[in-house]
């Protein structure tokens, strides 16, 4: 019972932090960066952080922990596979649109693409995520895939999932930091410099801290052996979350 209570407290924290990430990134870009548009202006760029944080981080993180929810244990796994794959697909769509937003902004302003460390890590993360989704779909959702193949692929699939989350966190916080260095320059646009810690810097830095906290909570859920979904034949195929203590 204690293991289950601990899970739901941690999972509630995961949900709260995820919502906070989305709210803060929208607040930052709406209140301090003038909102959103799709016209090649800076408002066009603002879609990039919002969609990447929402897609590659929050939706991705929640998709990763679906199988850990005890209420799903002992039931047909297919609906949860579909939910897992669906959240990841939505995450992929958000991420693609987010990448299109930044490429469109750069192209309109004749700015080079993929030159910074942030962009290198980010595009590698997106590529790995795409490969991970394709591997997961072909290995675990196609009924024709042999069980031996699924068993062979699963450890790599799980490991890659955690690594992609870590890379997403790195991409998000490096992107936030890069953006603040670009826009908070007293000598070029009259704003207070980043070093003076104006309100925008406080809001964006707070977003970065919450992103890290969200990622750590998701990794905690994924790494706790007590919260792993019991496999068939492990004497835990019966749905019993209220009595389950992780032993």
UniProtKB/Swiss-Prot annotation:
Molecular function terms, GO-annotated: metal ion binding; oxidoreductase activity; transmembrane ascorbate ferrireductase activity
Keyword Translocase applies: yes
Transmembrane regions: 4-24, 47-67, 83-103, 121-141, 156-176, 202-222
UniProt main location, coarse: membrane
CDD domains assigned: Cyt_b561_CYBASC3 (cd08762)
Cofactor(s) this protein cannot do without: heme b
Domain Cytochrome b561: 13-223
Lumenal side: 25-46, 104-120, 177-201
Subunit annotation: Homodimer.
Function of the molecule: Transmembrane reductase that uses ascorbate as an electron donor in the cytoplasm and transfers electrons across membranes to reduce iron cations Fe(3+) into Fe(2+) in the lumen of the late endosome and lysosome. Reduced iron can then be extruded from the late endosome and lysosome to the cytoplasm by divalent metal-specific transporters. It is therefore most probably involved in endosomal and lysosomal cellular iron homeostasis.
Name of the protein in question: Lysosomal membrane ascorbate-dependent ferrireductase CYB561A3
Organism: Danio rerio
Gene name of the record: cyb561a3a
